[in-house]
Regions:
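Glycine-enriched alpha-helix->loop->beta-strand junction motifs that scaffold or abut catalytic
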Residues: 14-18, 74-80
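Extended amphipathic alpha-helical segments with heptad-repeat/coiled-coil character used for oligomerization
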Residues: 84, 95-98, 102
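Acidic, His- and aromatic-enriched active-site or binding-groove loops in soluble protein domains
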Residues: 3, 77-86
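Active-site proximal loops enriched in glycine and acidic residues that flank catalytic Cys/His/Asp
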Residues: 62, 84-85, 146
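Metal-dependent polysaccharide deacetylase catalytic core of the NodB/CE4 family, i.e.
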Residues: 1-68, 91-98
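Terminal accessory/targeting
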Residues: 1-2, 99-215
Length: 215
């Protein structure tokens, strides 16, 4: 971990941006809404005391959030990152931006070189908007609506981890809408979908992460 003095030191650099990652770094979707707000507000208070401002950027712990929590974050931050893979473009929701993990497990140079060459697979919207899955909507009904300008959609492939097993997803294209049908319920804490398209100018990619409510 970094000390506050170290954070203040690097924060002075022109290309360094400090982000907020919550106070507890806990599984915040398990919190009731009041406890969630208290955690976020406490983190903001500490940042304001230590560096004089609350950062523009927030990163959801473990990439988990409900729609209610996302709406609260929108009143406190300008940008927020999930933990679903993908490439940022101008059409992405600025409160659920994608990010690829680069760490000791997923950080070899070959993978890094592949990731930095990826292009965004842009879309108008993804349903459902709420990424928190309950017993009532597991598996969720998922569709992705693309822009008319996106060509070669028949080349798209998706993989997902329902039933605790990564496999190729069953997909259906209706004009510019992609419908993803899951084989089973999501059994692990996080349900993931990764879609890629080998386009004329390179590989395009987007991902979705759901968090499965535990009762």
């Amino acid at each position: 971990y970094m000390t506050w003095d170290q954070i203040k030191e690097i924060e002075k650099e022109d290309f360094v941006f400090i982000g907020n990652h919550s106070h507890s770094h806990d599984y915040l979707v398990n919190y009731n809404f009041e406890k969630f707000k208290k955690d976020i507000d406490q983190s903001i208070k500490i940042f304001e005391e230590k560096i004089g401002y609350n950062p523009l950027f927030f990163s959801y712990p473990f990439g988990e959030y409900s729609l209610e929590q996302k709406n609260y974050i929108s009143n406190k931050f300008t940008y927020a990152f999930g933990q679903h893979s993908g490439v940022i473009d101008f059409n992405k929701d600025k409160l659920e931006l994608p990010r690829f993990p680069i760490n000791e497990k997923y950080g070899d140079l070959k993978r890094f070189e592949f990731l930095v060459k990826l292009l965004p697979l842009q879309y108008k919207k993804i349903e459902p908007e709420d990424k928190l899955i309950t017993r009532m909507n597991n598996p969720p009904k998922v569709f992705v609506e693309f822009f008319n300008e996106q060509q070669n959609l028949k080349r798209i492939n998706c993989f997902s981890n329902e039933g605790n097993e990564w496999d190729k997803s069953e997909i259906k294209l209706e004009n510019k809408k992609l419908i993803i049908k899951f084989r089973d319920k999501f059994l692990s804490r996080r349900g993931r979908v990764n879609c890629s398209l080998n386009d004329v100018d390179g590989w395009r990619w987007f991902g979705i992460q759901f968090v499965v409510e535990k009762n």
